[in-house]
Every structure is written in C-alpha cells, then in structure tokens.
From Swiss-Prot:
The keyword Cytoplasm is assigned to this record: yes
Major localization listed first in the record, in broad terms: cytoplasm
Family: Belongs to the prokaryotic/mitochondrial release factor family.
UniProt-listed NCBIfam families: prfA, PRK00591.1
Modified how: Methylated by PrmC. Methylation increases the termination efficiency of RF1.
Any one GO cellular component localisation term in the record: cytoplasm
Protein name: Peptide chain release factor 1
Gene name as annotated: prfA
Function in brief: Peptide chain release factor 1 directs the termination of translation in response to the peptide chain termination codons UAG and UAA.
Amino acid sequence: MIALPQDRMDQLLKRFSMIESQMANNPDSDTYVKLASEYSELQDVVGKIRELSDARMEASDLAAMRDDASTDAEMRALAVEELPEVEKRIAVLEQDVQILLLPKDAADDKNAILEIRAGTGGLEAALFAGDLFRMYERYAAEKGWRVELVSASEGDAGGYKEIIATVSGKGVFSKLKFESGVHRVQRVPETEAGGRIHTSAATVAVLPEAEDIDIEIRNEDIRIDTMRASGAGGQHVNTTDSAVRITHIPTGIMVVQAEKSQHQNRARAMQILRARLYDMERQKAESERSQARRSQVGSGDRSERIRTYNFPQGRVTDHRINLTLYKLDRVMEGDLDELVDALISDHQTALLAELGEQP
C-alpha cells in the first residue's frame, strides 16, 4: 500500500466541492471563468481520489464480511474471491493518485517553439534535420496539434540547416519537452557509392511559448537592428530593410528573423526571444531545485546526445533511459508515443523519489 498524503487529498476534495457550489451560484463571468479553469485542473485528481475512496470502502466491507463468522458461508466465499481483485484495483488507483499529486510543471500546458539545427555531418546533417522536422510534423498531426513555420534555412542538398516552427494544441510542451538535445543518425547517405555508414547529428530545442505575463522584457534591455534580407544566392528578397535582429543586452541572446515582412519579423523575433528567456529562467530554477532529478532524464543541455537513429539496424535508442526500439521506420513516421511516454514515466519516477527523500 502506498502512503498517500491524506490531508492533501482531503483539501482537494473540499476545494473541489467549494468550487462546484460557487459555480452553481451564478457568479459573474470573470469569476466563473477562473472557477471553471480550477475545476478543470482538479477534475482528474478528484475523480481518482473518489474512486480510490470507494474502492477502499468496498475492500473494507469485503474484509469484514470474510472475517465475520456469522456471515453466510456462500457470502464469505464470495468476499474471499472478490477481495484480491479490489485490492489490485486499489493498488492501481493509488499509483494514479500519487502521480496526479506530483508537482505540476507550469509550462506543461503551453504551446511550444520547436527549433531544429543541422549539426556535424554536412549535407547529411541537413537532410536529417529535415527528417526530424517531418517526424515531429506527423506526430503533431496525429495529436491534432497545429504546426506553423516561423523560419527555415534550406540545406544545399535538401533538408534544413535550421528550421523553427510553433506547435500549438493541448499538452504540447508536456509531450515535447524531453526532445531537446542532440539527435544522432547512423545511415548510408544516398550519395555514398561505397555503402559506408555515416554518422551525423542535429540539435533540437523545444521551448515553451511564453506570454507577456510569463517574462518581462524592458525596452531598454533590447537593441533592434534592421538589415537587408537576402535569399538564395545572396539576392535581396526585396528592396527594403526587412530583416530584424533583436539583441537582449543583459543576456546577449540574439534572434534574427529574415522573412519579407519587417513587422512580422519583429513580432516573431520577440516571440522567440521571449521563449528563450523564459526557458532560461525555467532551466535555472529547475537546476537550483534539484540537480538529482534533472540527471534522471538528462540535463536538458542542448549539447547532450539524447538519442541515436540507426537506419541499417532499424533501431532507435534513447540514451537517457536506455530504451531501444526496433521500429525506426514507424518512429520516423511520427510514432513517438512509446518513447515520449517512457520519458514522462521516468521523469515521474524521479519526482516520486525526490518527494520520498524529503523530510
């Protein structure tokens, strides 16, 4: 039996009942929206707590029936038969409740900015960056998310030297946040006549999309420069200074957007800058909170090799959790659930271990 914080569970049940009561009393629209949001957040955990409470009561009744000598023999036999099944259900519900009580990542419900950059490996690295982007596009489509291209620099032989996109939908960041790091590919390039396996890499960064309320950027802390945007072959995209470079002076973070619309470039550059600053704050807070926990699923360091895609063997290996799957073709088609769920599970296990170490 898992030792669950009963006081915390009772508080949640009491708060949920209070919200239900307040919502039934026709509050003003602003109050109703806030109550509805909190109601939605608590619904899953409260539902599981109630299920667990009912199951424990059922188990108690069955145990009493089994141990009561005055109970009909047939009823006692039925209690003996049913009690183990109810106890199994309790064990599952206790695990569910335990996970639902874990501290929430405030960014989990946010949309994400996905950045993929070709690393070592030349032309092949750019092709692999393109393959990764298509993999995430297909995964997003399967989840019902929307992917919107922000900017792209194409590779000389296809793929991308760099591609940035926003991914919007329910639970986007919670699913994609463990994708940050170096992804390595081992395969025979199409241009390789000798059939030799080449190794190349691409770096993935997944940032929670930040809003003004999440991170403050003061006007005096940024410098905005405009320049001519150039296209393929160095040709000017247009005759105006449309490219925008925004530098965040305190951190030195620089963002460049070079599409045709200067207004759009500025808005998108600020969007990316805000996300990077917010992510930097999150990483700093996470590091201070628990170095031990970060080491479980990897540090989140963009230079950390997290996964290898071996095409000759048809396998993908996630080095952080020592998980190898022999279904590379399906993974590249966006079948990422097994990888993503395993990473989330490992993270939850680490959180539980950390909570268990607290006095």
